[in-house]
From Swiss-Prot:
The encoding gene: pth
Pfam families: Pept_tRNA_hydro
Protein name: Peptidyl-tRNA hydrolase
Upper taxonomic lineage: Bacteria, Bacillati, Cyanobacteriota, Cyanophyceae, Synechococcales
Residues the entry annotates as binding tRNA: 18, 69, 71, 117
Family classification: Belongs to the PTH family.
The organism's place on the tree of life at top rank: Bacteria
Keywords per UniProt: Cytoplasm, Hydrolase, RNA-binding, tRNA-binding
Compartments where found: Cytoplasm
Site entry (Stabilizes the basic form of H active site to accept a proton), positions: 96
Length: 203
């Protein structure tokens, strides 16, 4: 990271009916982030996203919530990357992950989609797997082999419970602090710290 800008894109689905869905955890993190620093989101049609920016310690933070649906997230990410001519090491994608326990964080600098349709579309549109993604665990749906697909959909599109919110609030706090601290000198340390973080162990 050689520039004093960080580009953070949270994935989710637009629309009031999706606001509190587990699948919208990327949006929820960025809303917490912008609120903490008194910044508002405005719609930028050319970027296919809602956009917020603010400065902390000489760094400019540019936050984006795509107004495409999750499965078309790559359209917004491609528009953002092209407009700002972003080096991908300064880009951070925030997503939910059903394969991680609730509250677990996993930071990866590259890799496959892991079955996440939003990440899959970004890989397709950018034509590379080499970009940062920060996964937040939402836990797995109840096991029911006969209705596995249905259970997964209902789980990710289900609303976050009040108990889950208590867990995720601590995760948001940790991630926001880490994204602010992150720089080219401490990157490996921050990534390791995030990957070892689990809400239950840090109460």
């Amino acid at each position: 990271m050689n520039n004093n800008e960080k580009f953070i894109i949270g994935l989710g689905n637009p629309g009031k009916e999706y606001i509190q869905n587990r699948h919208n955890i990327g949006f929820l993190l960025l809303e917490n982030f912008s609120e903490k620093y008194d910044s508002k989101f405005t719609l930028k049609n050319k970027l296919k996203s809602w956009y917020s920016e603010f400065k902390i310690n000489n760094f400019t933070y540019r936050l984006f919530m795509p107004n495409t649906f999750m499965n078309n997230s790559g359209n917004a990410v491609r528009a953002i990357v092209d407009w700002y001519k972003i080096d991908l090491d300064r880009l951070f994608i925030i997503v939910d992950d059903i394969d991680l326990p609730l509250g677990k964080i996993r930071f990866r600098k590259k890799g496959s989609s892991g079955g996440h349709n939003g990440i899959k579309d970004i890989i397709n549109k950018l034509q590379t797997e080499n970009f940062n993604r920060i996964k937040i665990g939402i836990g797995s749906p109840p096991v029911n082999e006969r209705k596995k697909t249905l259970n997964t959909i209902s789980h990710v599109l289900g609303n976050i419970s009040s108990k889950e919110s208590l867990t995720l609030d601590r995760v948001y706090k940790k991630l926001i602090e880490s994204l602010i601290e992150l720089n080219d000198k401490n990157e490996d340390y921050i990534i390791s710290e995030l990957n070892s973080f689990h809400r239950e162990e840090n109460l």
